[in-house]
Amino acid sequence: MRTAFCLFLTLLAPLAQAQMVAPDVLVKGITDEVAATIVKDSDIQGGDTKKAADLIEAKIVPHFNFTRMARIAMARNWRSATPEQQKALASEFKTLLVRTYSTALVNYKGQRIDYKPLRAKPEDEEVTVKSEVKPSGSTQPVSIDYELEKTPNGWKIYDVKVDGISLVTTYRETFATEVRERGIDGLIKSLAAKNREPLGSKAGKS
């Protein structure tokens, strides 16, 4: 499935080391590592989204800036949130993305990923790593761009665009509606409730 595969790829580009390695090198390196793990893991290939989520938590989550991602998704409503609410929003947003993309990760079957040359200056604080993917059964490549920021702990991903569409800002309208109707606490409760729902997969298989 093209959409599921693209969603999976959005979480395949974290930093392998805290040292300041070139962002495109890091993206390719960790993508290759995670992709190889998936292909060899019969449980994930068989649809075990719990195991897929564990892989995401271990290999990918530490290298995303979920606070900035939540801030982008919340837009102007972020400024109205207290520090405690902001922390809760970032946490629930992280869990939501992990759960969402773990169901997509099991669809990866070794599709080819090509990377574009990085166009950035040494002093740049933010860069875009561009790639193209050729999903199985499709002749049309899918562009996937990773937006990264330089931090004291290395490069962190704060957004991903699939065919030019941000997978973070796609939540903006839904979040705005929730805040308008139920307030920020209502949005947090709504996200928490969704995150408590069963994954609806072969999770838990041992």
State the predicted function of each range.
Residues M1-A4:
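Positively charged n-region of N-terminal signal peptides that target proteins for export
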Residues P14-Q19:
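Sec/Tat signal peptide C-region and signal peptidase I cleavage site
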Residues E132-K134, L148, D185-I188:
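Low-complexity, acidic/polar, glycine-enriched regions of mature
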Residues D159-S206:
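Low-complexity, intrinsically disordered terminal/linker segments enriched in charged
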